[in-house]
């Protein structure tokens, strides 16, 4: 659970080293649960960050970075390191921003520069990271989104609980994203598992399922970009909290569902809510996988016989069943605007 103080001395730090969170005001909490692949626990490719004290009294920043590919962990950590370093170094400038256009230019320039750093390495042809960040300056909140992680605001209008999405997922199935990809040498198809993915025209790769990332050099040659989208919102008295999470949360829980869950659980100690939400998401993955496993086992058993070909097929089915048990990393950060809400 993320409620530790952090230091801003990043000199000499490597991207893969985890920075401690700075959450001195005890209003921002986090939880991360590593995923599984073929029923084995993974080291996890998500990273997250919370910066409050180091940015001064009127500014806060928190983010989730969702890595993918063989170097996904390194990608998410490198992105975290670069954003943190820039924001702390530029805090005196950023804290004076009063318009959305200023925030847009700052983060678009930052991500563009970071992408150039990724391109200088040979490690990120097929690996990269998404990002969902929230910057708060006084009573204005800005969501900075790149990929398919998500930010959602929870408000209470009278007795009604309202979920306001503060980001729009960057999926190749989006018409505007698909148009750009097609214009730049890529195509969007559903070759693998019915999920819209990005391929170079007339080729079998890269097969990326998100349309904006850092890294992913091959995919950037066919329309994927590193330009984030920014949404601005003034924080109002009815606004209770904002939650950000990797797609491991949103794949099995809708935005209204997550907001309702947090409202229901925040009556207890708020510092446990991020952990409870992450565990609820993980439990849903487990239930879905149990259902998949049973369905595939039933199908495999109905086709069994004793000949060698069937035995080989049975072994292959077992491999497929294990593959169906993959569980994504789950990372949650929640900022409560008022601890006594």
Q: Each predicted region: which residue ranges?
A:
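PP2C/PPM-type serine/threonine phosphatase catalytic domain
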Residues: 1-341
């Amino acid at each position: 659970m993320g409620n530790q103080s952090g230091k801003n001395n990043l000199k000499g730090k490597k991207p893969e080293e985890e920075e401690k969170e700075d959450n001195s005001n005890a209003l921002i909490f986090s939880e991360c649960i590593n995923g599984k692949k073929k029923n084995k626990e993974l080291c996890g490719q998500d990273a997250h960050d919370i910066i409050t004290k180091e940015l001064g009294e009127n500014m806060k920043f928190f983010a989730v970075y969702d890595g993918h590919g063989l170097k996904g962990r390194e990608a998410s950590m490198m992105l975290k390191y670069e954003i943190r370093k820039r924001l702390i170094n530029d805090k005196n400038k950023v804290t004076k921003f009063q318009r959305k256009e200023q925030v847009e230019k700052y983060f678009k320039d930052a991500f563009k520069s970071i992408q150039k750093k990724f391109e200088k390495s040979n490690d990120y042809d097929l690996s990269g990271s998404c990002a969902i960040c929230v910057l708060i300056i006084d009573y204005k909140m800005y969501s900075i989104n790149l990929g398919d992680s998500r930010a959602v605001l929870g408000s209470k209008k009278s007795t009604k609980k309202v979920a306001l999405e503060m980001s729009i997922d960057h999926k190749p199935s989006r018409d505007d994203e698909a148009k750009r990809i097609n214009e730049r040498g890529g195509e969007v198809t559903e070759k693998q598992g019915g999920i819209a993915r990005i391929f170079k025209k007339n080729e079998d790769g890269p097969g990326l399922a998100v349309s904006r990332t850092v890294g992913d050099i091959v995919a950037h040659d066919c329309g994927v970009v590193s330009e984030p989208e920014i949404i601005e919102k003034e924080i109002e008295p009815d606004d209770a909290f904002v939650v950000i999470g990797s797609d491991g949360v949103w794949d099995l829980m809708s935005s209204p569902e997550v907001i309702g869950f947090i409202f229901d659980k925040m009556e207890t100690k708020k510092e446990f809510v991020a952990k409870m939400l992450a565990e609820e998401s993980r439990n849903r993955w487990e239930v879905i996988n149990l259902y998949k496993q049973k369905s595939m086992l039933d199908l495999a058993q109905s086709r069994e016989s004793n000949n060698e070909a069937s035995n080989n097929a049975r072994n292959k089915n077992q491999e497929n069943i294990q593959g169906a048990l993959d569980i994504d990393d789950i990372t949650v950060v929640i900022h409560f605007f008022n601890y006594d809400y």
